[in-house]
């Protein structure tokens, strides 16, 4: 999502929300959980407002964009709650943009700490137009084929969490950064160009304007109901192994939040058993609580999609440390500086 779009969303939110008061909580969030009607966010936000009387002021943008906005507002924070994905949540923590807060659900959530907590499980995925392509690209090398020239697009590393995940997945699949950047340099010949948001690529694939794009499992499964030509795939490495980077939605309380107590209430609400039980039903995500296992068809479909695909994750703190240098190198090899 472009910064101008983020600004427009912010203006809309401020114009449509009540005057600044104790009955408001402001959320800066990565896209994906508010897609479509009756989304998980929408249902939980409505339930939260009904239970507490606290209105949600919602601003949406790319995973890196929302953190950049927090950083710019450091001296005058406007948000109470941040939802983004790795490695941007680690960057926010390192830049001291997050406040200490242990959630009520911390003991039931692996990887939760005093600065942030996983909110919804999710994984990097890729999508293709199944009407125009008889089969999905089988491997990373297949994506270099000339038939994908100007028919392939992935969101921009450093701006979009899913785009950053593509770069990290390449590191994993190719076994080294050098090999990965060499590949991504070649892939650029087919790449349409930059995209600050991943979510909008699905419609382009569905219409056939492009054949292949990146995404994430939760968002793509939710979008497929409205985009019938889209199917999910994972390209294999040279050993024939398919793998998917785990990129959960992660939530944290903003340092200096104007309505900190309301932010804490919302975070605890979204991590409650009741809310977590419905994340697959409403938005195709997977709950992060170890004591919640949904039985709905969406949850079954999400777990089935991952069969034969190995999930993995790096040391996110290490990723955050080298991210700026890696993004700079990506711009250099793709000649997109």
From Swiss-Prot:
Subcellular location: Periplasm
UniProtKB keywords: Periplasm, Signal, Transport
Cross-referenced Gene3D superfamilies: Periplasmic binding protein-like II
Signal sequence residues: 1-21
Main localization category: periplasm
InterPro entries: AminoethylPonate_ABC-bd, SBP
GO cellular component: outer membrane-bounded periplasmic space
Swiss-Prot/TrEMBL GO biological process terms: thiamine transport
One Pfam entry name: SBP_bac_1
MF GO annotations: thiamine binding; thiamine pyrophosphate binding
Described purpose of this protein according to its UniProt entry: Probably part of the PhnSTUV complex (TC 3.A.1.11.5) involved in 2-aminoethylphosphonate import.
Family, as annotated: Belongs to the bacterial solute-binding protein 1 family.
Name of protein: Putative 2-aminoethylphosphonate-binding periplasmic protein
Native source organism of the sequence: Salmonella typhi
Lineage: Bacteria, Pseudomonadati, Pseudomonadota, Gammaproteobacteria, Enterobacterales
